[in-house]
C-alpha cells in the first residue's frame, strides 16, 4: 500500500462517493477502501507534540444515522413529499436536461436531507432526535465544504419553501417570507443573488426553478441583513 497518494480524486462530484483513502495508523500507509467514508472529523490527540501525529477521529453519529435513511428514501422515490417537491427534486437530479448546469451530489444530498426531515413520513425518522435550544425556531444545519456550492443550496432551499407555500398556503411547514442573516457586508453583497428579481439571480443562473414555477417565485419576500 502507498505511503503517499498519487491519485487524490477517486469519485465523481455528481455521484455518491463509492470509495475513499484511509490512513492506517499501524502501517503508516494509505489504504483504498471500497465504500463511502463515514461522516466525522479529526482532532489532535491530547498531549500530541509531533506534526506527523494523525490525530483522533471523531464520528458524527447523528449524520451517520441519517445518511442511510435519506438514501433509502431517495431510492424509494421520496415518499411523503408534495407534488411540488417531487417536481423540484426530479428537475434538480435529471442530468439529461441540465447539461452544463449539473448539481453536485453534495448539493443534492444537502437539500434532500432537509426535505426528508420536513416532509418524509414520521416513521422514517423514528429514533432521530436533532438537538434544540428550545427556541421558537428549530435550527437545522447542512455542513458543506468550501467550493461545494453552498449559495446554490440556499437558492434550492428558498425555492422549495416558497413554491410549496404559494401552492399550499395552509401548510405551515413552508414559508414564502425568507430572512437571510449574513456575517459582514461582503457576504451580504454576494448573497444578493438569492433575491429572485436581482440581476443574474441563482434561480435562473443555475436552473434552480423550472420554467412553469418562475412566476410563482415573484410572490416570495427575501430579505438579507447583517447581524
Regions found by a protein language model. Give the residues of each.
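RecA-like P-loop NTPase motor core of helicase/translocase proteins
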Residues: 1-227
